[in-house]
């Protein structure tokens, strides 16, 4: 997919055969360091992210045509090489290339961010989204300062971090969930 400047995309992928892509906390931290290291070289903005044991989700805005694919390829080639070396394994780590879905209805952007931030709760990994440290939910609600976060984007919709927290804690209406399905990973 050719990523177009000014558009928002849900980027995701999962491990081969739904296997874990992170074997330790250090693996999560390594990937986040790589993202922060490489991000300044690319014209894109991270809106929301969530790293899960078997998959990842990014909500990204392309600031320049074609900026997302080279970035994703670079960080995950680097990550896969490091992971394979650490785990004494070889071969592919992911189910093919990253998937990308354009968010053509911008009114759903915050619902998608909420969906991503609730992923660890739905998976039974935590009781509250703020307990999962491998997403930027804590930035959204003011518990952590981070660089993979667009504060202006959040303030466009929510006056305070507490408003976003309440939005996330409210159940996603079924009608909204049905509409979000076209933007989501199959069998999440």
Annotate the PLM regions.
Residues 1-47, 52, 61-188:
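Short Pro-Cys-Gly-centered "Cys-loop" motif that presents a nucleophilic cysteine in a tight turn
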């Amino acid at each position: 997919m050719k990523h177009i400047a000014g558009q928002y995309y849900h980027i995701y992928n999962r491990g081969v055969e739904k296997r874990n892509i992170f074997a330790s906390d250090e693996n999560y931290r390594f990937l986040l360091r790589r993202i922060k290291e490489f991000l300044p070289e690319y014209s894109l903005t991270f809106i929301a992210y969530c790293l899960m044991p078997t998959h990842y989700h990014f909500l990204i805005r392309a600031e320049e045509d074609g900026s997302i694919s080279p970035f994703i390829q670079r960080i995950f080639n680097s990550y896969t090489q490091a992971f394979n070396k650490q785990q004494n394994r070889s071969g592919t780590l992911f189910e093919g290339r990253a998937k990308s879905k354009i968010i053509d209805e911008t009114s759903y952007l915050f619902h998608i961010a909420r969906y991503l931030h609730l992923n660890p709760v739905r998976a039974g990994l935590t009781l509250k989204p703020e307990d999962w440290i491998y997403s930027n939910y804590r930035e959204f609600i003011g518990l952590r300062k981070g660089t993979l976060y667009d504060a202006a984007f959040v303030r466009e919709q929510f006056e305070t971090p507490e408003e976003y927290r309440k939005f996330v804690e409210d159940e996603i209406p079924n009608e909204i969930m049905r509409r979000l399905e076209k933007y989501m990973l199959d069998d999440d």
